[in-house]
Every structure is written in C-alpha cells, then in structure tokens.
Amino acid sequence: MSNQDLKRQLINPPQTQVLYDTYHFSQANRVGNIVWVSGQVGIDANFVPGADITEQSHLAFQALRGILEEAGGSLADVVELITFHTDLQGEVHAFGQVKDEYFPDRYPAWSAVGVTQLSLPQLRVEVRAVAVIGSGKA
C-alpha cells in the first residue's frame, strides 16, 4: 500500500455540509479501504427527528447508506456497528427489527450502548459504523 492510498479523504455529502461548517466534523473519513462513519441520527432532510424509534432507526440507516455510497461502498461493507440508545432496554427489539432490514445477512459486529441523552432531546438512537470498502462483495 502506497502513501497515496493512506491519504485521508473526508466524506461529507452536500446535504451535510452545514454540519461540517457549523460543528466542524466529517460525516466519515476514509483511509485506504477503511471508512469510519460518524454517528448518524434519525433526522430527516430538514433536520427534524423521526416520530418514534422505528422511524428514527430507518432515517439513521438511510443516512449511513448514503454516506457509504458517497465513499464508494455500501451497507454490505459494514464490519462494525456501535449504536447508542436513550432507552436501550425498552427499544432494542424494535431497533433490531429495523437493523435486520438493512443487514439481512453477513451481520456486522454490533455493540449497543445505553446513554442518557443524544444531541437533540427528541433523538432516541445514534448509529456509528466502520466499513471496509469492497468487503461486502460476494
């Protein structure tokens, strides 16, 4: 692997540029074939949180998918998920059902962490991921 392959690439889809400019973080960083994705939350294009854990989970996974596609990968390339939940015990089953829609097989490693709050009071879940681009191809 050459030094050029190890150059860090910032991944910030156009709709997230305001977050990069305001809060000074990237949605993801890619080095070689590895992509580290910042926590994705259940907000829509207008930054409005979804109504419940199911809607927020779908929105978070859709955002994750979009960032990975921007980085040249897909959800199939995810090797690790770390999720943060404001009601882990009460909502992990509903979250898990949504997760399984996006990862129907070749399950990534997954750690679920209970937290007292996320960046907005209405948020219930945040999803972080690590992906290895190309690893999900059959």
Please report, for each region that a protein language model flagged, where it lies by residue:
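N-terminal presequence-like segments and the immediate start of the first folded domain
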Residues: 1-62, 66-79, 85-138
